[in-house]
């Protein structure tokens, strides 16, 4: 029986990830790379935005396996708030690996109904490409941006992220990295929500880039 192209691509991707996992487990352990500063030091005042920490439950942090994290709500007058989550992994060799929001969101009751990419011009004059999702629970919709950041790269694709993690483990003896996710309700429409997340990301990026090791 012939397999569909989509099925073949799935098995190829699964094989690559399995090989990457085996390789990382069999290689000698590299040092865990600590943040330049704890994520708690990320400014609570970002442009017009003011942040408030929203600690996660201990069991959630344990399941995530993060070395450090911050989970905040940023707000400003007369504007819909933005939720920011950054989870940092000093090493991904021992089973604690970055969990894709694409897999975690359905478990929390939010279903992805639209996906794509967004290109954002950040301070310094360069573009970053991030994942863009619209998620829905009942009649509520939210817009999500997320990306993987570390070792001098900002990556949207999970497969590229795994590739570079293995390559850097071999070349640099490093597997550190962070997941960055920003979310905002779409009660004022998708276009307005997108403008809000793009602006917030542009304001956030320089401060975040100072904390995550290159």
State the predicted function of each range:
Residues 43-75:
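Short extracytoplasmic
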Residues 29-46:
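Alpha-helical transmembrane signal-anchor/signal-peptide segments
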Residues 15-16, 42, 197:
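Active-site-proximal structural scaffolding
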Residues 10-25:
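Hydrophobic membrane-insertion alpha-helices, especially the h-region
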């Amino acid at each position: 029986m012939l397999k569909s192209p989509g099925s073949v691509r799935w098995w190829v991707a699964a094989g690559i990830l399995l090989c990457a996992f085996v390789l990382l487990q069999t290689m000698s352990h590299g040092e865990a790379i600590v943040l330049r500063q704890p994520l708690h030091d990320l400014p609570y005042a970002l442009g017009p935005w003011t942040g408030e920490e929203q600690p996660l439950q201990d069991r959630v942090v344990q399941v995530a396996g993060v070395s450090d994290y911050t989970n905040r709500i940023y707000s400003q007058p007369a504007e819909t708030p933005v939720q920011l989550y950054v989870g940092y992994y000093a090493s991904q060799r021992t089973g604690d690996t970055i969990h894709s929001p694409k897999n975690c969101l359905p478990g929390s009751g939010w279903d992805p109904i639209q996906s794509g990419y967004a290109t954002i011009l950040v301070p310094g004059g360069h573009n970053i490409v991030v994942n863009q999702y619209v998620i829905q629970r009942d009649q509520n919709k939210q817009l999500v941006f997320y990306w993987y950041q570390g070792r001098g790269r900002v990556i949207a694709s999970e497969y590229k992220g795994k590739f570079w993690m293995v390559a850097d483990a071999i070349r640099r003896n490093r597997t550190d990295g962070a997941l960055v996710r920003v979310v905002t309700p779409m009660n004022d429409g998708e276009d307005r929500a997108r403008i809000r997340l793009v602006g917030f990301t542009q304001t956030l990026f320089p401060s975040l880039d100072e904390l995550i090791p290159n």
